């Protein structure tokens, strides 16, 4: 029953996406369908057999792609492409990841964007997740992290002269990832910066979700975009 409901809801979103883009769920040749086809065709498969032929997708997979393209992310490359082979898992994950990815927007994670990106980069470095790093290092600078901070994380050294808020989140993330716990002192410092327990839970959620993301691209050995050199070699 749950699988049936997921397919039914997904097909409804698929039809709504086509309609919103100027077509209908049963109408071929629309700009929306062309975008879906191009998105799938441009996926770069690694070791997991990510489908790149739109006509070979089943109903769940088409609904999964349409759901992502109609949401705030609008892109299905990297770990979300890997999870196309398990679209029910992918759909649940991409919705949770969107909540974390777009921190600071209404209805999304309460963690300030630059601190959210700080944690994401630290998780990406932990896993040497090239694809995650490529997707986030420049965005992290746009959100307010100093380029020197980003470079220090890439090199695996503690950034120097961190502002108080970044220092608290760096210490919490580092300690939690290394020891799988956090001292009261470290937790309380991060809690103060994030304004309470919701911020802490949102931050740990981001750390967990981006470990999933990093694990997926590590499993797949997802290629970087053409022309992009590896970051961790």
What are these regions (language model features)?
Residues 76-82, 112-126, 199-204:
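Alpha-helical scaffold segments that form or flank carboxylate-/histidine-based iron centers
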Residues 22-110, 232:
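Mobile cap/lid helix-loop segments that border enzyme active or cofactor-binding sites
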Residues 115-153:
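Mid-length scaffold segments of soluble, non-membrane domains
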């Amino acid at each position: 029953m749950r699988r049936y409901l997921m397919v039914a809801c997904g097909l409804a979103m698929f039809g709504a996406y086509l309609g919103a883009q100027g077509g209908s769920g049963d109408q071929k040749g629309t700009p929306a369908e062309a975008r879906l086809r191009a998105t799938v065709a441009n996926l770069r498969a690694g070791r997991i057999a990510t489908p790149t032929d739109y006509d070979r997708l089943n109903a769940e997979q088409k609904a999964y792609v349409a759901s992502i393209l109609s949401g705030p992310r609008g892109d299905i490359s990297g770990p979300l492409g890997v999870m196309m082979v398990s679209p029910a898992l992918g759909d649940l994950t991409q919705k949770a990841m969107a909540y974390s990815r777009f921190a600071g927007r209404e209805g999304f994670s309460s963690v300030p964007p630059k601190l959210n990106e700080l944690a994401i980069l630290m998780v990406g470095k932990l896993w040497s997740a090239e694809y995650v790093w490529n997707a986030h290092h420049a965005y992290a600078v746009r959100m307010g992290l100093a380029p020197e901070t980003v470079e220090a994380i890439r090199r695996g050294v503690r950034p120097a002269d961190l502002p108080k808020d970044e220092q608290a989140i760096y210490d919490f993330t580092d300690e939690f990832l290394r020891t799988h716990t956090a001292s009261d002192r470290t937790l309380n410092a991060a809690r103060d910066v994030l304004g309470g327990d919701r911020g802490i839970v949102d931050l740990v959620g981001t750390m967990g979700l981006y470990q999933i993301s990093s694990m997926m691209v590590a499993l797949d050995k997802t290629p970087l975009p053409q022309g992009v050199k590896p970051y961790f070699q």
